[in-house]
Swiss-Prot record:
Monomer. Catalyzes the transfer of a dimethylallyl group onto the adenine at position 37 in tRNAs that read codons beginning with uridine, leading to the formation of N6-(dimethylallyl)adenosine (i(6)A). Belongs to the IPP transferase family. InterPro entries: Dimethylallyltransferase, IPT, P-loop_NTPase. Residues 36-39 are annotated as: Interaction with substrate tRNA. This is tRNA dimethylallyltransferase 2. The gene is miaA2. The record marks T105 as: Interaction with substrate tRNA. Signal peptide: none annotated.
């Protein structure tokens, strides 16, 4: 009987997650499910770093899921990701294969590893009013009486604690069947890249994608009728390149501000992954600089290692 139902490969931007996932998928004859919140969009290729050529290993196309599934302008969210992930996961498992979930969007990855379905929770003004005068200590005690959906590290302010209670209260009144989400036992691999090397690779990739036509990609999206507000909403490359195309930033301003923003984004990704470890997930970190064959071999050894 298989020890794991899934392999998850995570890491910050420019760490080499996708080539590793593809090399592993080739070795295991399996398929990749993308866990990236922006690669779901069609025609947003250079700006989201799709690098589709990475999915070809030794001349073989590695099947992938959840890339290019919605049109630009749409506001895709984590609730839809859970649904779409399960559909893709079931398709791969149906073939008796071990799927590989690969991405850097921590919220998306954690949403399927946690084991409960996320629901969009509306505000409850009446409940908020009833909690408004309580201290953080009182709210934390109250929160502890619910089925534990939240970790205490997430509720370090009164506002967060009230929202956590609001979510717990909403879930309490949903049927168990509605909340059901399969328990997926995943081997989680983290690609660990030294900060300076990460920064160097981010800067190199940014220059490379600009050379490959990222500005023209943004112009084409705007020309096709996608609003500048929608592109700015997607953040990072699309935000700063749109501001550049609109004449609100010079090229140098755009490049400098975008470079800083991507470095900050990578740092936030690592913060999320370290938070996952505090929340009880075991992440097996591999040095990004190891030869690909060594990384793949280490993962396969972990797959077969007994607890």
């Amino acid at each position: 009987m298989e020890k794991y139902d899934l392999i998850t490969i995570l890491g910050p931007t420019a760490s080499g997650k996708t080539p590793l996932a593809a090399a592993l998928a080739y070795k295991l004859d399996t398929e990749i499910i993308s866990g990236d919140s922006r690669q779901v969009y069609r025609r947003m290729d250079l700006g989201t770093g799709k690098d589709l050529e990475d999915y070809v290993v030794n001349g073989q196309q590695i099947p992938y899921h959840l890339i290019d599934i919605v049109d630009p302008g749409y506001k895709y969210n984590v609730f839809e990701f859970q649904r779409d992930f399960l559909n893709a996961y079931d398709q791969v498992r149906w073939k008796d294969k071990l799927p590989i979930l690969c991405g850097g969007t921590g919220m998306y990855l954690e949403s399927v590893l946690k084991g409960y379905r996320l629901l969009p929770v509306p505000e409850n003004p009446k409940l908020r009013d009833s909690l408004a005068d309580k201290s953080l200590a009182e709210l934390t005690r109250l929160l502890s009486t619910y089925r534990k959906l939240h970790n205490s590290t997430d509720v370090d302010t009164v506002k967060r604690a009230i929202r956590a209670i609001e979510i717990e209260e909403y879930y309490k009144h949903q049927s168990a069947e509605y909340r059901e989400f399969p328990q997926i036992h995943s081997l989680i691999i983290g690609v660990d890249i030294a900060r300076e090397l990460r920064r160097e690779k981010i800067s190199h990739r940014l220059k490379q994608r600009l050379d490959e036509g990222m500005v023209n990609e943004v112009k084409a999206l705007l020309d096709s009728g996608i609003s500048s507000e929608d592109l700015i909403y997607y953040g990072l490359e699309y935000k700063y390149l749109t501001l550049y195309v609109l004449g609100k930033l010079s090229f140098n301003e755009m490049f400098h501000q975008l470079e800083i923003a991507i470095h900050q984004f990578a740092k936030r990704q690592m913060t999320w992954f370290r938070g996952m470890e505090r929340r009880g997930f075991t992440i097996h970190w591999l040095d990004a600089c190891l030869p690909m064959e060594d990384k793949v071999e280490k993962i396969i050894n972990l797959l077969h290692t007994k607890n």
